[in-house]
Swiss-Prot record:
GO cellular component, one term: membrane
Gene that encodes it: yhcB
Disulfide bonds, paired cysteine numbers: none
All copies of domain Flavodoxin-like, residue ranges: 3-162
Protein's name according to its UniProt entry: Uncharacterized protein YhcB
One GO MF term attached to the UniProt entry: NAD(P)H dehydrogenase (quinone) activity
Top-rank lineage group of the source organism: Bacteria
Length: 176
C-alpha cells in the first residue's frame, strides 16, 4: 500500500510532526510511505496512493496559504473521481493552546469529503490520544517560547496517526 504525507511548514514544527506520522506509517511492513513539503508535492502522485495525509500550521483556525493553494489545484481529480475511497487523514500545529487546532483540522478534512475520501481520525482508545490529541487527527500545540520543536507527546501522537492510517488502509486494500 502507498501512503503520501504532504505538509506545509514554516518553522519546522509541522515538518517534525509530518516525519513522526511517516515513521508511524512505516511501522507497517506493507506500507510504502512518501513524504513531501507542499512546494515539492506532486498532485499527479495522488492517483497512485492508497492513503493521503496532509497537514499544516494553523492560521487563526484556517489552512496555511501554501497548502490551501495546493488543495485548490485538486479540482481535476475531483472531476475524474480519482480520490474516491482513498483513505485520508489530517494534522496540524499551532503556537498557542487556543490557536484553532480543531477548526484547522475541520478545514483540512472538508476537501477530503468533497473528494469522496474515507477520513480516518484518532479514536479515544488510542493511548496517545486520550489526554493530548483530537479525534479529528493529530493536532499539536508548539509554544514559541519552548526550546524544543515538538514535545515527545506530540511526536507519539503523530506516530499513532501514521500507524492508524496504515492499519485502516491495509484493512481496506487487503481485499483488492
Amino acid at each position: 500500500m502507498k501512503i503520501y504525507v504532504v505538509y506545509d511548514s514554516e518553522g519546522e514544527h509541522t515538518k517534525v510532526l509530518a516525519e513522526a506520522i511517516a515513521e508511524g506509517a512505516r511501522e507497517n511492513d506493507a506500507a510504502e510511505v512518501f513524504i513531501d513539503h507542499v512546494d515539492q508535492a506532486d498532485i499527479r502522485k495522488l492517483k497512485d496512493m492508497d492513503a493521503i495525509i496532509w497537514g499544516c500550521p494553523g492560521h487563526f483556525g484556517t489552512i496555511s496559504s501554501g497548502l490551501k493553494t495546493w488543495i485548490d489545484r485538486l479540482g481535476y481529480l475531483w472531476a475524474e473521481g480519482e480520490l474516491i475511497n482513498k483513505v485520508g487523514a489530517v494534522f496540524c500545529t499551532t503556537a498557542t493552546t487556543h490557536g484553532g487546532l480543531e477548526m484547522t483540522m475541520h478545514n483540512l478534512i472538508t476537501p477530503m469529503f468533497h473528494q469522496g475520501m474515507i477520513v480516518v481520525g484518532l479514536p479515544g482508545n488510542v493511548p496517545e490520544n486520550a489526554l493530548y490529541g483530537s479525534y479529528y487527527g493529530a493536532g499539536v500545540t508548539c509554544p514559541v517560547d519552548s526550546d524544543e520543536l515538538m514535545s515527545e507527546e506530540g511526536i507519539q501522537l503523530g506516530r499513532a496517526l501514521g500507524r492508524r492510517v496504515s492499519q485502516v488502509t491495509g484493512n481496506l486494500t487487503a481485499g483488492q
